[in-house]
Structure formats: structure tokens, C-alpha cells
Amino acid sequence: ENFTYKHADKIIVISEDFKKNIMAKGVPEDKIVVVYNWVDQNAVIDIPRDKNKLFDKYQLDRSKFYIEYSGNIGLTQNMDMLLEVMKELKTTHPDIGLVLVGEGAYKAQVEEIVKRDNLTNVTMIPFQPYEDISYVFSLGDAGLVISKPGVGANSVPSKTWSIMSASRPVLANFDENELKDILAGNECGIFTKAGDKEAFKQSVIKLYENRDLCMKYGTNGRKFVMDNLTREVGTQKYVDVIKEVCGGK
């Protein structure tokens, strides 16, 4: 590993966290280039609420403010905390709803809690066909990226890019890593520390009470995708690195 780092003219990594990791091993910063794994910016787009068929299919109220989680409903996603927040918001902010899209090992327990606590502000939806992915990520006014503490320190979940591609702000309750820097640096969401229930609840309320900010963050998220995550941007960065290395020989 060290031999490779020492003799390479340039090293391409897929995230700022990977860059920090190899810099800690003594690799000079000017030797490292970050090129994100690209996404298909046309696979997930914003579907206006009045044209989103899933609102009709699952009897969702188009006048409400929704936060949405789409993905694995498992043991590490901190669903208990999320449902506690929704229990509190049901009393204080009845116009805020949660849409849960997905399957997983903890889904039955989630359904039991929703029924036990009469969480009428929570709607559970099964995974949808891939061709409806834009409809799915356009259900919420904001998209959720959540985990229990200690689970996500070294990763940015891929659903982050889908949320941003749909022009939705990201509400992250996650371990501190590159995701925090992306959301803050590009003003495309709100980051709270994994497990901090009150901070997370306040982030939901903040976007609910400021729809202009919510839309701004969503627009900025889409811009980040277009500026950094398209195939065209990614491949051009590879070409630029190759040209630089070859030109120096």
C-alpha cells in the first residue's frame, strides 16, 4: 500500500473522507484527486406533488408537510428515535407527516409501534417498482438519512444523492463525516448528530416553518448533483488527471 502511494503520480479517491484517510498515512494533499462515484441525474427527478400518482395510491394529503425515509427498515436505522419524534410532533405539529418506504428486519416492530401509539401521522409504503423511483423520492418535502450512533462514520449513504437529485433537502441524523460537510458547505440540508432526538426534531420543524428555506436547500442539492455527480463531470475529471500525469512525463 505505501509503495503504491509513494510511486503513484496521482491517486484518485471517491470521497473527501478517503482523502483524509490516506493523507493521515503521509500522502501529500496535492497528489490526491477526489472524484465521486457518478449517478444518473435523469434517474431521479422532481415530480410535482399534483402529478405524483403515489399521493392518490396511498391516500396522502397533498396539503401536509412530509418527511420521507426510503430504504432498509432495519436494526441500525434508529427507527425508534424517528417514531418518538413523530409521536411528539403529532401533538405539536399535526400537519407534519412521515412516509416510510421500504422493507427490512425491523418493519414488523415499526408497524406494531405505529399501531400501539396510534401514529396516524405515519404512512408505511412498500418498495415501489424502480421505474417509479422519482415518484418515491418526490413524496417528501425533505428526505431522511438516519442511523444509530456508530454505524455510519465512514460512509455517505447513496440515498443522499437520490434525495438531492429529486430537489429535496436532506435531513441527516448521522455520524459526523463528509455528509455533514457536504450539507453545510452546499446549503442543501440540515445535519444533526446521530441519536440527538431533540436536534433532529427541531431540524424538521425548521424546514416545516420555513418553506422557502426548504425549497432553497432542495434546489442547491440538485445543483450539487449536476456540478459533481454526473457521468460527464466524473469522466472529465479522470481525463484531466490522465492528461496532467501524461503531460508531466
Predicted ranges, named:
Residues 45-60:
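A short helix/loop element that forms part of the nucleotide-sugar donor recognition site in Leloir-type
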Residues 77, 129-135, 143-164, 170-181:
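Nucleotide-sugar-dependent
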Residues 1-11:
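Membrane-proximal helix-turn-helix segments that form the acceptor-binding/catalytic region
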Residues 61-77, 83-86, 99:
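Conserved donor-binding/catalytic core segment of Leloir-type glycosyltransferases
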Residues 199-206, 213-227, 240:
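A short, well-ordered alpha-helix in the C-terminal region of glycosyltransferases
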Residues 99-102, 107-134:
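Nucleotide-activated donor-binding/catalytic signature segment of Leloir-type glycosyltransferases, i.e.
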Residues 17, 38:
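Carbohydrate-associated surface elements
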Residues 185-186, 190-197, 206-212:
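Conserved acidic donor-binding segment of nucleotide-sugar-dependent glycosyltransferases
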